[in-house]
């Protein structure tokens, strides 16, 4: 199962999700039809102190569950998930590019995925010093961006932040 889903995005007919784990173990998942993602048996998070049962199984596969593509321990409180803008896709040279916001880590996270979209091959974080909640989308679900590639992110402090990516290749 899933514990606390936060964001969903589709790339090339594949569905990706972010979810909060318990005291760590936040996940990026590739959703597979009829797949079981382990909750409440398997998690990379830690049980809360008021629960007397043993810790979670760390390995999802040993129990027939699907492993996350990526997990964060300690927790970053991952939130929204969107496909990268065309400018970022061109810059990184791949369709498999996702943006996620984080509340606790207060950063924008860029996930780079393999060509098959079945594993994370790179991750970048940009710190904002604010709890980031949502990335603006168009009515059709595409990530909203201005002609220069900038995006807009809302924070829990009530701010709307315009993010411009200075995409200069070495």
Predicted regions and their residues:
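Conserved beta-strand positions that form and line the central face of beta-propeller blades
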Residues: 125
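Short beta-strand-to-coil "C-cap" segments at the C-terminal boundary of structured domains/repeats
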Residues: 161-169
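Surface loops and adjacent helix of pleckstrin homology
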Residues: 20, 156, 165
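Short coil-to-beta transitions that initiate beta-strands within beta-rich domains
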Residues: 77-78, 128-134
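Beta-propeller domain segments
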Residues: 1-121, 140-150, 168-170
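A generic structural signal for well-ordered alpha-helical surface patches
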Residues: 106, 130-133, 158
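Structural signature of WD-repeat beta-propellers
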Residues: 103, 155-156
């Amino acid at each position: 199962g899933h514990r606390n889903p936060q964001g969903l995005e589709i790339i090339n007919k594949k569905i990706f999700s972010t979810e909060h784990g318990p005291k760590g173990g936040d996940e990026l998942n590739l959703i597979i039809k009829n797949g079981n993602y382990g909750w409440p048996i398997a998690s990379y998070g830690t049980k809360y102190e008021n629960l007397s049962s043993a810790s979670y199984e760390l390995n999802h596969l040993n129990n027939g569950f699907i492993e996350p593509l990526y997990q964060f321990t300690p927790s970053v409180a991952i939130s929204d998930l969107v496909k990268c803008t065309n400018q970022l896709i061109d810059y990184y040279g791949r369709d498999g590019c996702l943006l996620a916001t984080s509340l606790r880590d207060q950063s924008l996270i860029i996930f780079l995925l393999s060509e098959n979209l079945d594993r994370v091959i790179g991750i970048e974080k940009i710190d904002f010093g604010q709890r980031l909640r949502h990335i603006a989308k168009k009515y059709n679900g595409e990530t909203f961006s201005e002609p220069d590639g900038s995006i807009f992110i809302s924070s829990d402090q009530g701010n709307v932040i315009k993010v411009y990516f200075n995409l200069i290749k070495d």
